[in-house]
């Protein structure tokens, strides 16, 4: 089992975001702005969905990694730490999914 966490990935994204856009894909996305990063996130989400529909386990793992990475880039640009998202997930799991949905 891997000990690598989303917080670890978030730290890598933060470091790479400070690099030259000529040398780092992360920096290039951050420099291009939220529209470009969000578009890329959407593309990766579609690719993950396609892999899931095809029951392509290996590709679903690969595309899920891309999806998580691009989500963290979008969160970085929006200045939202992954911890904030995890807190929201924790809040939601304190009640049943149906109760949470009804409370919206």
From Swiss-Prot:
Key word Nucleotide-binding present in the record?
yes
The protein's matches in NCBIfam families, at most eight in alphabetical order, are given as: histidine_hisI, PRK00400.1-3, PRK00400.1-5
Does the entry feature the keyword ATP-binding, yes or no?
yes
* Keywords noted in UniProt: Amino-acid biosynthesis, ATP-binding, Cytoplasm, Histidine biosynthesis, Hydrolase, Nucleotide-binding
Q: Which reaction does it catalyse?
A: 1-(5-phospho-beta-D-ribosyl)-ATP + H2O = 1-(5-phospho-beta-D-ribosyl)-5'-AMP + diphosphate + H(+)
Any one of the GO CC terms: cytoplasm
User: Which pathway?
Assistant: Amino-acid biosynthesis; L-histidine biosynthesis; L-histidine from 5-phospho-alpha-D-ribose 1-diphosphate: step 2/9
Q: What's its EC? A: 3.6.1.31
**Subcellular localization, as worded in the UniProt entry:** Cytoplasm
Source organism, top-level taxon: Bacteria
Q: Which GO terms describe its biological process?
A: L-histidine biosynthetic process
Q: What is this protein called?
A: Phosphoribosyl-ATP pyrophosphatase
Q: Which cysteines are joined by disulfide bonds?
A: none
């Amino acid at each position: 089992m891997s000990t690598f966490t989303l917080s670890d990935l978030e730290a890598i994204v933060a470091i790479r975001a400070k690099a030259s856009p000529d040398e780092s894909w992360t920096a290039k996305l951050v420099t291009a702005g939220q529209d470009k990063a969000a578009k890329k996130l959407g593309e990766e989400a579609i690719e993950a969905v396609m892999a899931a529909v095809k029951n392509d386990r290996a590709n679903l793992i690969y595309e899920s990694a891309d999806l998580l990475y691009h989500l963290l880039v979008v969160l970085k640009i929006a200045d939202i730490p992954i911890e904030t998202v995890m807190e929201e997930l924790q809040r939601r799991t304190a009640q049943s999914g149906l109760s949470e949905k009804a409370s919206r």
